[in-house]
């Protein structure tokens, strides 16, 4: 236990304002929802995740995998083989969370063309840049 003024103080569990707050605590991070999405397919090796999630750096991917593991939603499986073989799987908790993201994936699929157009207009694609 941590000490405050030489007295042991019990750690305080985080308080969440609502269920969404608790969910966001787990999935906040640019790549975490994509990691969960790709792990829904089953055991996945690091290299497969790296190829599937474009533009993520090794440092950030490793950090976010560790954070998701600490949150109890994924498991790192080290097979203790030579050459080394490691993969990642969702825990039961992670399965339920990743499945909850599926409606968001469907929304993105249904609205992808509209979103591409809006972002292109916003970012000035297709216009001459001054």
Region spans (language model):
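Beta-hairpin "wing" of winged helix-turn-helix
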Residues: 69-89
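Proline-rich low-complexity regions
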Residues: 54, 83-84, 99, 103
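C-terminal regulatory/oligomerization modules of transcriptional regulators
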Residues: 1-17, 70, 75, 92-130
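N-terminal helix-turn-helix DNA-binding core of bacterial DNA-binding proteins
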Residues: 14-60, 66, 80, 87, ...
């Amino acid at each position: 236990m941590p000490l405050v003024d030489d007295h042991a103080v019990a750690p305080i569990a985080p308080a969440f304002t609502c269920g969404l707050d608790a969910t966001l605590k787990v999935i906040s991070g640019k790549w975490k929802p994509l990691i969960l999405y790709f792990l829904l397919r089953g055991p996945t090796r690091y290299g497969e995740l790296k190829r599937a999630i474009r533009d993520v750096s090794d440092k950030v991917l490793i950090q976010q995998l560790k954070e998701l593991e600490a949150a109890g939603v994924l498991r790192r499986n080290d097979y203790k083989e030579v050459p080394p073989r490691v993969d990642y799987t969702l825990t039961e908790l992670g399965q339920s969370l990743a499945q909850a993201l599926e409606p968001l994936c469907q929304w993105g699929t249904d609205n992808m063309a509209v979103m591409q157009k809006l972002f292109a207009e916003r970012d000035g694609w297709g216009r001459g840049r001054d």
